[in-house]
Amino acid sequence: MRREIIDIKLGSLWFIVGGNFASMRYLGADMFLLRHGQSYFNLHFNQSGVDPGIKDPELTPFGIAQAAAAATTLATSKLTRILVSPYTRALQTVEPIRALYDLPVDVLHEVRERAAFTCDVGSTPDVLATRFPQHDFAHLPRQWWHEGTEPLEATIARANNFRSLMSTRTDSDTTLLVSHWAFLLALTGVSLENAEIMEYDPASPAPPKMAPYA
């Protein structure tokens, strides 16, 4: 397993971060997984431990810089397919990667975060289409996120379905998924930091059952 350290100048500060700034985990694997960059929910919740009550939060300036760094890390990955969750924080994270590769992006609500906090209340497809006109949201249900707290078993089932689907494809090694902490944990058994990239073999067995956290 290798972790890359990336330094980037943001404003007047230098960030030299290993575990949470576009670092990479290698498991000798296939497709690329990327957790979204730091959102305003992450910023406030990590400081206070209290849900700040922000629905569908945007990325912070640091999160935007993390997304740009992730794009740089993935620049030589020869991506042919990009999948992304419909949450704003994921759509903002994917933007510099989409621009780099000039690829259409498939927006999939099946890879969304496990609903447990206010940040997991999403935006309707019409609102998303206004914010991100470069993407197609017409296929999404009006309320594509889970109402209230999603049962852990439902999150695991979504992850298992996605793993099964990707294991049958021949392009998994050039596919990127931009998703969220709990979904990626259910998929891989690994807790990823904001903007951390992981290579993952979708033919791997399902990880041990997640412990409830909310």
What spans do the regions from the language model cover?
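Basic polycationic patches enriched in arginine
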Residues: 2-3
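Acidic, low-complexity terminal tails and accessory targeting/binding regions
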Residues: 11-30, 114-134, 170-173, 185-214
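Active-site-proximal alpha-helix that buttresses catalytic centers in soluble enzyme cores
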Residues: 26-30, 34-107, 129-131, 156, ...
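Short active-site segment of divalent metal-dependent hydrolases/proteases
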Residues: 39, 183-184
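Phosphate-handling substructures
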Residues: 43-44, 48, 53-58, 100-160, ...
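A generic secondary-structure signal
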Residues: 69-73, 161-168
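Glycine-rich phosphate-binding loop signature in dinucleotide/nucleotide-binding domains
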Residues: 76-78, 166-173
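Short, well-ordered beta-to-alpha junction loops that form the rim of enzyme active sites
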Residues: 84-88, 110-111, 178-182
